[in-house]
Amino acid sequence: MSLILYPSLPPTMTPLLSLATALAVKRAVEGTTSARVDLKWPNDVYLSGGKLAGVLVEMAAEIDRVKWVIDSIGINVNNRIVGTDLEGRATSLADELWKEISRRELAVALLMHLEKIYREAQSPAGLISIQRSFRKYDLLQGRPVEVKTPDGVISGTADGIDSEGRLLVRDITGKVQSLFSGEATITGIQTR
């Protein structure tokens, strides 16, 4: 599912839209099924240690304003992951819950939660609320991580997100780096 949005946010705040979208996916999945999911910065939703959903946010912006955003969401609903080469890395609602899930019901719930959280994201108080909510379900918080960035690999402990939705990583010297994008992996444990 992809949506075109016209947020009244400065470009520096758009990483929060990815987090907000992941939060809306969480609320929709948990509101329509018995599944309980976690969020992984910057754009993933996990269930039982496997990736259930992903979010991709693309934008066009000027220096001080966002012109538009394309907010794309992919959820493994009734896909069968067990027995494929994705087993161990990804999962689906059907595989985890052992039953088919109504895509229509999930889509309606997702659109409802997206609308609500998108409206919330238009105000400073709403953005703070989104940050707090994301932090509650942050799979990386307090865990050892490696983050692949265009500039190399950053290792340390995930220390939450900042006010603009960037991942904070504390290295062994105590220095905290704020990362705008990257692929984060929990180290020292194997997921799924």
Features from the language model and the residues they span:
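Short, acidic Gly/Pro/Ser/Thr-rich loop/turn segments
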Residues: S8, V77-R80, R166
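Conserved beta-strand residues within beta-sheet cores
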Residues: P42, L52-G54, Q131, G142-P144, ...
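Conserved RNA-binding domains used in RNP assembly and mRNA/RNA metabolism
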Residues: Q141-R192
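Short, acidic (Asp/Glu-rich) active-site segment that either coordinates a divalent metal cofactor
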Residues: D64-D95
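Conserved, helical-rich catalytic subdomain that frames metal- and/or nucleotide-binding sites
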Residues: E96-D151, I189-R192
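Contiguous, small/hydrophobic- and glycine-enriched helical/loop subdomains that border
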Residues: M1-W68, E100-E105, M112, K116-P124
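Residue-level signal for pocket-adjacent positions within structured domains
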Residues: K40-W41, G50, I81, G88-T91, ...
